Structure formats: structure tokens, C-alpha cells
Amino acid sequence: MMRIAVASEGLDVSNHFGCCTNFNYYKVIDNQLVDSRNLPSHGHLCGSQANFLRQIEVRVLLCGTISQNDIESMNKAGITVVSGASGNALQAVEEYLQGNAEQLVVHN
């Protein structure tokens, strides 16, 4: 099982990780979405988002843009950051899972 979080504003990917208001959270088994939730963002203090996402066992974070400091915090928490996502969060996850998102950049 894999857990993916999308830094979001409502149901859409947030333009910048630091400005996200919530996370759309997806559980994936055998490349199939089996559960989704909308979770509030827990502030943007140094490392707080990484700790929160680690606690809910997220392994991949999809986002629009993200600072190098946030990438490093996520990577230290064992979370792979994938930037360059946009549009609807669910569609971004589906494209990521299908390998159809050429605009995405993986940071790990």
C-alpha cells in the first residue's frame, strides 16, 4: 500500500506548497485508489508539515512548487516530493500513477 498526499486548495493542487490550505490524501493498492480524504493543513512551521505527513504514513507528496528547505524536510521524513503538479488533485494522482505526467519532477 502507498499513501499519497496532494498539497491543495480545496480539490485542486495548490500553486505553492507553502500556501496549501489542505491535503487531499489517497491510499493506493496495486496502483488503484482505494480511499481518499481531505485533511486540513497543520501550519507551516519548520518541519511541521513533514512530521504530520510522516505520522499519517505518506510516502509521496504531490505539489505545484515547493522550497528547497521543504523538500529537504520531506526527504528527511522519508517522503518523496513530486513537484510540477497542477489542476484537479485526483487527476494529478491518477496521472502520476499512470506515469503520464511528463511535467513532474521527483525530488528524493
Give the ranges of each region predicted by the language model:
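Amphipathic alpha-helical interaction surfaces in cytosolic regulatory modules
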Residues: A50-R54, V60, G64-N75
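C-terminal structural segments of small proteins and small subunits
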Residues: Q68-N108
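N-terminal first-folded block
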Residues: M2-S41
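Compact, glycine-rich, soluble single-domain proteins
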Residues: S36-I56, V60
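Short secondary-structure boundary segments
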Residues: S8, G64-T65, A85-S86
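Short connector loops at helix/strand junctions that flank enzyme active sites
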Residues: G18-C20, I56, K76
